[in-house]
Design a protein with these regions (language model features):
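Short beta-strand edge/turn micro-motifs at domain boundaries
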Residues: 129-153
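Amphipathic alpha-helical repeat scaffolds
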Residues: 35, 39-43
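A short acidic/glycine-rich loop-to-helix N-cap element
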Residues: 24-25, 122-127
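Short helix-adjacent coil turns
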Residues: 41, 48-49
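A short, structured loop/turn motif at beta-sheet edges
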Residues: 101-109, 123, 136-142
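Bacterial Sec-dependent N-terminal signal peptides
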Residues: 1-29
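A solvent-exposed, acidic/Ser-Thr-rich amphipathic alpha-helical stretch
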Residues: 28, 32-33, 50-107, 114-116, ...
């Protein structure tokens, strides 16, 4: 009897360890996917690739900004087009170590982080560091942002 109980306990422990390892592996995988998509999006932003940038958002995008209010896909695209035309060298960089990613089962993932934007103003570099949340949806194998919250400006 005691021998059977030991095997049952061992089986339960091994199963729990296996499930924890699989859960961590899935979390690492989605983290890597979103970190990559963040890089793709802001490489497009920094290189002024408007078409690539546009392709990373859904048409029903909601963009919440603590200073600018609620805007949409069209406003975001127009902003990117203005950035591409300007010569102020606006650039975004993710603050190293700030990225957090949480799965949203059946939908996608939530990306939380801190980023710095720098641009030239009167010939001098002007930078600000801000917080953000991106809600990514994975549909037909493609990641796109459906919601943005930009805050702490």
């Amino acid at each position: 009897m005691k021998s059977n109980l030991k095997y049952i306990v061992l089986l339960v422990v091994l199963t729990a360890m296996f499930n924890m390892a699989n859960a961590q592996s899935a979390k690492d995988s989605i983290y890597n996917e979103i970190a990559h998509m963040d890089s793709v999006m802001f490489n497009a932003f920094n290189s002024r690739d408007v078409e690539k940038f546009k392709s990373l958002f859904t048409q029903d995008l909601e963009f919440y900004h603590d200073k600018g209010g609620l805007t949409n896909y069209e406003h975001t695209v127009n902003f990117m087009e203005d950035v591409a035309k300007s010569n102020n060298e606006l650039r975004r960089d993710l603050v190293k170590g700030s990225l957090e990613v949480y799965p949203i089962p059946g939908y996608g993932a939530m990306e939380i982080g801190v980023h710095t934007f720098c641009h030239l103003e009167n010939g001098k570099k002007d930078c600000g560091t801000f917080k953000f949340v991106h809600i990514w949806q994975k549909k037909n194998g493609e990641w796109k942002i459906t919601r943005v919250v930009s805050y702490d400006h």
